Amino acid sequence: DLRMSRGLGDVYKRQADDRTIFVGANNSGKTSAMDCLILFFRDKKSFTTQDFTLSNWREINKIGNDYIVYSKESDLDENKLSISAWQPFVPQLDVWINVEENEIHYVNRIIPTLDWASGKLGIRLRFEPKDIKTLYTDYTTAKSTIEELTKDRSKKATKLWPIHLWDFLQKKLHTYFTVNAYILDPSKFGQGDTPQLLSEDNIPIDFDPFQGLVKIDIINAQRGFSDPNTPETGISNLSSQLREYYSKHINPTETIDATDLDALEAIEEANKAFDIRLEAGFSSSLDELRNLNYPGFGNPEISISTKVSPVDGLKHDSAVLFNVQKGETDEQCLRLSEKYNGLGYQNLISMIFKLIRFRDEWMKVGKIAKNSTHEIEPLHIILVEEPEAHLHAQVQQVFIRKAYDVLRNHARLKEKKDFCTQLIISTHSSHIAHECDFKSLRYFKRNITQNQIPTSTVINLSKTFGAEDETTKFAKRYLKTTHCDLFFADAAILIEGQAERMLLPFFINQEFPKLASAYISLLEIGGSHAHRLRPLIDDLGIITLIITDIDSVDPNAHRRSVRPEKGKNYVTNSSTLKQWTPAKESIEELVDLASTKKQSSNGLVRVAYQYGTKITFKNKVVTVYPYTFEEALVFDNIDLFKSMKGDGLIKKYSEALNESTIKECLRKMFEACLLYTSDAADE
């Protein structure tokens, strides 16, 4: 659970069993969550004031103002300098792990109580003041100095440091702040969404609680801009990685054993042969030096000795070759060096090999085992930030399918439970989301607030997709067979037919330029099935427009489709209108419903359907009630469609508009709609 960091509010990220995927729209907090995990686990010294939830600095500055007030009191009550004042506003991370009885030796230094035997064990990492009294004294002294400098000036002085507590800490954050670790009470695990409070009596532990327990590895996105994260956590080409792998796991000159003797003998023979060749090649040059009486008497004789290092053989562009065409012999095989291969494939190979390196370093494969004195950590966490930054769309799905299997491809891993691997990926790729079990998705939802700095919370979609009812099955099938960009959209439009799918993007581009610049997911739901996506839409909290047909039927005539009319007791057959919003069935009510009544109670979902429209027909103003989206479009553009030449539905609409009476016009249009709807269903 991550709390109060960057643009995040309270983030509850229950990890999936093997891999967890962070999804969400742009600027929803995915990268902030990944970076904060890196800060807490790996780069504690890299915290900045920007890593606090920005809206909390108002409250932190109030703490600074209180300190100024306290400093003017004659007798300071030190109880006012309490860590509890800071607790709600500083970044913190709660880590919960499940410990079996046979694993207690890994956690013997962080056991919460004497009677704890196994089960949940929690650690809170909190970035907080080291010593509040020191912070109080130094801050109030700095402010007092500024007051003394400016109090006699007749004009307002230039703003001097520190303006407020944030300004003070921007320069000296790590002088006064550190990451402390606390043991949590396992009996309070899962009691609501509010993190358990720590009392003033809770004392931080004075060691790294995760040393020997968790191994962390990272692949950053490397966006090409100045990246605050360490550069070595990105990807490099395969040649560079092979050199690093060789040095750690293979190098025969390190911690020599019997298997290295043949290699060392070959290196020695190569050194001798090279020495002889160099001595012969440089002999005339060295003789010239001797004729200068140098080295001379008492000076050392010059000789040449080489040292062949196998890893040097990997320090060139063609260290890694790809066979592009096989030959009858090895010499006839056509090869290209790594840099001439496709960039997407290069990056895929490099990223997969980096995962292999992470796994083998964790499992201490090869020489690294002899150079290490500590046990293998039982938990391996790999953080991969936006792999699509390196990979083309075609290989993104290959990566996500293979990544976890690669991390477990070791004799001590596979399906065994002794060591656990947790792969955490942040992504903005619908291709990657498509390949994942939706239960592994964690959706970052931007909170919609007015006059406040925006924050995000995280929705655990394992609850949304965990059930096996028909609604959930439909949502899974629909997203799998179409696309998953709903998880990354700023808003969604749910439509029913092909006409809407073709025309809506055109309408948006022509009439709504602001919408055109937003990331809107257009989802075509065949028939009136939009309501089946309601649980997902509600959980995502995404702004949604549903365009549906009113679909009027006569309940007294075997629910036969009829043209919408008032006073006939007709009802809608649309499940969206009946079960979602506005949750009404009567056509009489629906066609007269106020616009404000066509949205959900939280204002995030709005439904649009046909209603009464005044048109001029044969010089008379009449009110008509369209049956479909297409009909409504025609009635809004009568002159255009009346003269339009075409086939099929367009021809039928044109003929209907040229009828002599409105009654006959509506009859023919309705027949055309029914025929079109039937043909579309058959297709």
What are these regions (language model features)?
Residues 19-62, 341-358, 397, 401-402, ...:
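Phosphate-binding glycine-rich loops of NTP-binding sites
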Residues 2, 7-15, 676-682:
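Conserved small/polar residues in nucleotide/adenosyl-binding loops
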Residues 13-17, 374-376:
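Phosphate-binding P-loop
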Residues 42-74, 359-377, 409-420, 451, ...:
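Flexible phosphate/Mg2+-sensing switch loops adjacent to catalytic phosphate-binding sites
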Residues 398-492, 499-513, 539, 560-578:
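C-terminal lobe/lid and adjacent interdomain/linker elements of RecA-like ASCE P-loop ATPase modules
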Residues 208, 476-494, 498-683:
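Acidic, Mg2+-coordinating catalytic modules of nucleic-acid enzymes
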Residues 221-384, 405, 409-411:
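Extended helical coiled-coil dimerization/tether regions that scaffold
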Residues 51, 55-57, 62, 67-92, ...:
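Glycine-rich phosphate-binding loops of NTPases
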